[in-house]
Regions:
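Non-catalytic, solvent-exposed segments at the cell envelope interface
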Residues: 2-313
C-alpha cells in the first residue's frame, strides 16, 4: 500500500507535466555562454485564451485578445553557495530590442513572442536563459482555488475596479479572483509597477509555501487537483524540463522562508520620457555588477545595493 501511495505522489506531477503546452523560446545565433548555475525566465501573461466568458466576468479580466507580459521575473539558481534569486524586470524597462531599436521590454514579447523576449533579456543581462515558463490569468487563479485559497498580508487598503478587487489592510486568505487582482493592481500602490512587482514575488512565494504543506502533498485528491491546476494555464519552452520547473518552484518557495532573495533589477529612473513614452531606465552599472556576480557564481547572501526598487537617479 505504501509503495502504491508513493507511486501516486510521483505520478501526479509527471502526468500533469505531460499535458502542458510548449512553445519555442530559444533564440538562434549568438547567445551568452552558460555561466554558473541555472537561469530561467518566468513570465505572467494577460492571456484570456483559456477562460470561458463566465470566468472572464468572475475574474474581471475583460476580453482583450492575445497575450502580453504582465510579469517578468529572472530566476537564478546557483550551483554552489549563496541564495537563489528572483529579479523582477519592470515591463516598462526601456531596452534594446534586437532588430527593432529601443522600446519597452514588453514590446519584445508583443513583436516576437517568447523567443524575442528571451533574446532581449539575454543581451541586456549577459545571462544565458536555460528555460522558459509562462502562466496566464486563468492558470494563476485556478491554482489558488485548488489550494483552497492562499494566506497573504495586505499592506494597505486596495480598491481597484480595474483589477476587480476591494481588499482591506491585514492578513487574510485570498481566493483565486482576489489573488489575481492582488498581483495585477498597480494604481492602488504608491510605488506603481515596482510595488506591484514586489507583491507578485510575495504571492508566488506564498503559493509555493501552501502547495508544499502536508495537507496538500499528503492528500491524494488535493495533490492531484493542485498539480493539474498548476499546468492548466502553463506554457513552457520546448526544452524546459520537469527538473527545471522543480528548481523554479523551490526558488519560489524560498521567498517565504528567506532562503531566496527577492529583488528588483537596479533602476535609475522609473518615470523617464522616451520615444516609447513614460519608461523605466536601469542603473546600468549596478545592474551589470549584479548580473556579473550571478554569472560568475559569486555567492549572494543578502540583497545587493540598488535592488530594492528605489531609483538611483
Amino acid at each position: 500500500m505504501l509503495a502504491g501511495y508513493l507511486g501516486f505522489e510521483a505520478y501526479a506531477p509527471w502526468h500533469a507535466w505531460g499535458t502542458v503546452a510548449r512553445v519555442a523560446s530559444e533564440p538562434t545565433g549568438d547567445r551568452p555562454i552558460s555561466g554558473d548555475g541555472h537561469t530561467y525566465l518566468l513570465v505572467g501573461s494577460d492571456s484570456r485564451e483559456d477562460l470561458t466568458p463566465a470566468e472572464r466576468k468572475r475574474l474581471g479580466t475583460g476580453s482583450d485578445p492575445g497575450r502580453r507580459t504582465d510579469t517578468i521575473i529572472v530566476v537564478h539558481v546557483p550551483s554552489g553557495d549563496g541564495k537563489s534569486t528572483l529579479i523582477s524586470i519592470p515591463r516598462d524597462s526601456y531596452l534594446p530590442i534586437p532588430g527593432h531599436g529601443h522600446n519597452k521590454v514588453n514590446a519584445a514579447f508583443a513583436i516576437g513572442g517568447p523567443v524575442l523576449l528571451v533574446e532581449t533579456l539575454e543581451q541586456a543581462t549577459g545571462l544565458r536563459i536555460d528555460g522558459y515558463l509562462e502562466i496566464g490569468f486563468g492558470g494563476f487563479s485556478r491554482v489558488v482555488d485548488a489550494l483552497g485559497g492562499v494566506d497573504i498580508c495586505v499592506k494597505f487598503d486596495m480598491v481597484d475596479p480595474k483589477a476587480n478587487i476591494n481588499l482591506k489592510k491585514g492578513c487574510q486568505t485570498l481566493s483565486g479572483p482576489q489573488a489575481l487582482g492582488f498581483v495585477r493592481s498597480r494604481y492602488t500602490d504608491p510605488r506603481g509597477d515596482i510595488g506591484r512587482a514586489e507583491r507578485q514575488r510575495q504571492f508566488l512565494g506564498a503559493i509555493m509555501k501552501k502547495a508544499a504543506q502536508p495537507a496538500t502533498v499528503l492528500n491524494p485528491v488535493s495533490w492531484w487537483r493542485t498539480t493539474h491546476a498548476a499546468v492548466a494555464g502553463l506554457i513552457i519552452g520546448e526544452d524546459t524540463s520537469l527538473l527545471d520547473a522543480g528548481r523554479v518552484a523551490l526558488t519560489l518557495r524560498g521567498v517565504s522562508s528567506g532562503d531566496t532573495l527577492s529583488l528588483v533589477v537596479p533602476l535609475k529612473d522609473t518615470n523617464a520620457t522616451t520615444a516609447a513614452g513614460s519608461s523605466v531606465l536601469w542603473d546600468d552599472a549596478a545592474a551589470g555588477q549584479l548580473f556579473t556576480m550571478l554569472r560568475n557564481g559569486d555567492p549572494l547572501e543578502s540583497p545587493p545595493a540598488g535592488t530594492d526598487g528605489k531609483p538611483s537617479g
